[in-house]
């Protein structure tokens, strides 16, 4: 699943061999104020381009939603349903519930921080796909997958819940993106789609009492290393991951195409290797 923030990136994702893309429109998505976004008027064209090339389209509606946002939330999901978007990616029960009520398919966003099978059982009534918390290790992911199979945890379609995980890109320093740095520094809430990436800046560290600057090995002390799983995708598949998501809706089309191509090739190689082992 490739990230798309412009028509150029959409075409790059298609050329790179994406099986699906995810994107946002004006509001209520986690990049609504920190990167380029489409508008409601773009939905039909995006869906048409995706269908023409045999890929699925997923619309993010995954910010914190306040009472005053409910009319906009319904308007966005109505537009998604009318344009026949494949699914919305949601993190608020209000959005999930409304989407279900009008027959719009839902995927569970990583913003929900689903990190165990019991939480997944609760949310399974709303969605057929879950983007698990990024903080999980492969052993924990496999345990959730085992519970899905053993307990027959199914979504609205009556099929077993499918696991989706981020496979490549920037990682938030906060748990599942619930960060307040942008709000503290610039009065811009990351939880409302306005992450200013404060954590990815270089910092010096001083002792407040002595005013002595500490000697640190890496100035990027609040920025985790970017995620890269291309060298163990076979292990992710064995753990039950079925959808590999690339971070980067704010990235340019060159990045989108290159990373999508690399991961598509890696998926094919892993599948071929699995078949050979069998």
Region spans (language model):
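N-terminal basic/disordered segments at the start of proteins
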Residues: 1-20
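Conserved small/polar residues in nucleotide/adenosyl-binding loops
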Residues: 274-278
